[in-house]
UniProtKB/Swiss-Prot annotation:
Family statement: Belongs to the imidazoleglycerol-phosphate dehydratase family.
Key words, A-Z: Amino-acid biosynthesis, Cytoplasm, Histidine biosynthesis, Lyase
Organism: Roseiflexus castenholzii (strain DSM 13941 / HLO8)
Pfam families referenced in this protein's UniProt entry, alphabetically: IGPD
UniProt-annotated location(s): Cytoplasm
Annotated protein name in UniProt: Imidazoleglycerol-phosphate dehydratase
Molecular-function GO term, any one: imidazoleglycerol-phosphate dehydratase activity
Repressor listed as a keyword: no
Cross-referenced PANTHER family: IMIDAZOLEGLYCEROL-PHOSPHATE DEHYDRATASE, IMIDAZOLEGLYCEROL-PHOSPHATE DEHYDRATASE HIS7
Superkingdom assignment: Bacteria
Amino acid sequence: MQRAATIERQTGETNVALMLNIDGSGRVDIATGIGFLDHMLHLFARHGLFDLAVRADGDLHVDEHHTAEDVCICLGQAFDRALGERRGLVRTAHAYVPMDEALGFVAVDLSGRPYCVVDAAFVTPRVGRLGTDLIAHLFESIAVHGRMNLHARVLYGRNDHHKVEALFKALGRALDAATRIDERLGGVVPSTKGVL
């Protein structure tokens, strides 16, 4: 069974179409109109080995907030839909990823309970056209709409591009590990409650 989903979101601010294949090979086709966000989603998918296609048209004449947020809402929804009942999942995983002088850490639990904590300090207001104040909100959008517990932290670093890149790579690697099927579970839901 292919674990994939297509999400479309149309609002008065944005028009987003996103396709995710969890069991992919890292193929990407991404155009959001925000170059740095495209770059982060590209390396997220490559490090997670997810196939990811994104097309977004938004009110970038206002700012990048609505477009970036709605893309990450759709990404979270795609994970939630593609995972279905989440039977047989490893469920929890974490990853440390260095990017030159920066070190990022992400831990996830595909528990069905959305919660997000981001501990990251940035020194510049934006990287490219993406405001650094949005990074925590983007991770929160993925967590809430993906119904997952997500903790992200920049342990240290100087360059804001490197810090954000370490976090997105770590998120891809953590989700790759957490979404794997553990054959020892025999297809049951990975919870003592029997449901997620």
